[in-house]
């Protein structure tokens, strides 16, 4: 599991794209020229940006070669660059930086977010959506299984919190709109939950394990999911998935 799997990620494409659609709807920009899609993945969020601003110069950034290859194939009119978000520098100031479900993987948001604001043009917008599920059973159980089986903690850090992000971005010279939404995804089985998180949150836990160790981990994880996520009357499972949204507009 050394690289991301675009096919597995896109298995829940509609569910993963919905927050991007709702974030994009809150971006208060009309005619703009330069856009960066940070953590563009296979290009599903980039496609939304291209649909809204077809004349804009859009650059998608991702550290995964597989994701970049998939995005280039899907959107030949956009530029895609394999790079680390923290180190990438645009050639010109950006009118919009769009980051859908990517910045949660990076550390030290107290430095990262002001850095991103510095890349914006005056009145430019930083639009961010991050999963806020560190305390949800899906992610708590990952840590519990790892502890039980004596594996090191490889999960991402919790988000800084609403008040922290508001202060960080206000001090960086932005007007800030911030909100949190919990989605309830209908899942047909506990295995479907595993399929969902294997493409994202579970990757760091599994990537350094042998095939046998992965199977041992997933078997125990499945057992614990069954305890935490009861079936609905119709046999479906409701997977609560909170997400944090931020739209920060740089002052002139």
UniProtKB/Swiss-Prot annotation:
InterPro entries: Methyltransf_25, SAM-dependent_MTases_sf, Trans-aconitate_MeTrfase, Trans_acon_MeTrfase_C. Its EC number is 2.1.1.144. It is found in: Cytoplasm. CDD domains: AdoMet_MTases. Coiled coil: none annotated. Keywords: Cytoplasm, Methyltransferase, S-adenosyl-L-methionine, Transferase. One of its GO terms (molecular function) is trans-aconitate 2-methyltransferase activity. Pfam families: Methyltransf_25 (PF13649). GO terms for cellular component: cytoplasm. It catalyses: trans-aconitate + S-adenosyl-L-methionine = (E)-3-(methoxycarbonyl)pent-2-enedioate + S-adenosyl-L-homocysteine. The keyword Metal-binding does not apply. One of its GO terms (biological process) is methylation. Catalyzes the S-adenosylmethionine monomethyl esterification of trans-aconitate. Belongs to the methyltransferase superfamily. Tam family. This is Trans-aconitate 2-methyltransferase.
